[in-house]
Amino acid sequence: MKKAYFAISYSNRSLFDKEVDSLRKLFLKNNIELLVFVDKYSFRPNQEKEMMKVAFEEIDNSDFLIAELTTKSIGVGIEIGYAFAKNKPVFYLRKKDSEYSTTSSGCSTAIIAYRNEFDLKETIGKILKLKMSS
């Protein structure tokens, strides 16, 4: 089973329940595990080194990274940079009309601006079909 690392700001995670649920269902149908780091792990404020060590290990063990950056996040930017340095495909997601990150897009395999969870699922679904047919 392939594995996708989902990078999202901890403080904004609850705003994207519909998007995460939609992707989780789509990926399950395509035999891909969606690992949402902020859902799987919890760290105390003094555990930042351990947190990043675990994050980097999870990225190393993933086939690609999906970054939700409707709201910019330093932590997600670090995860993108790490995945890019490890030659992992990076998919940069943001809601249409949100601020565009040139640094994140510069490290991305694909940039997906979406309206809602249905639009996101359809666009990612097309990308998965292209990748699986090639």
Please place each PLM-identified region on the residue numbering:
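Conserved catalytic or regulatory cores that recognize and/or transform ribose-phosphate-containing ligands
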Residues: 1-134
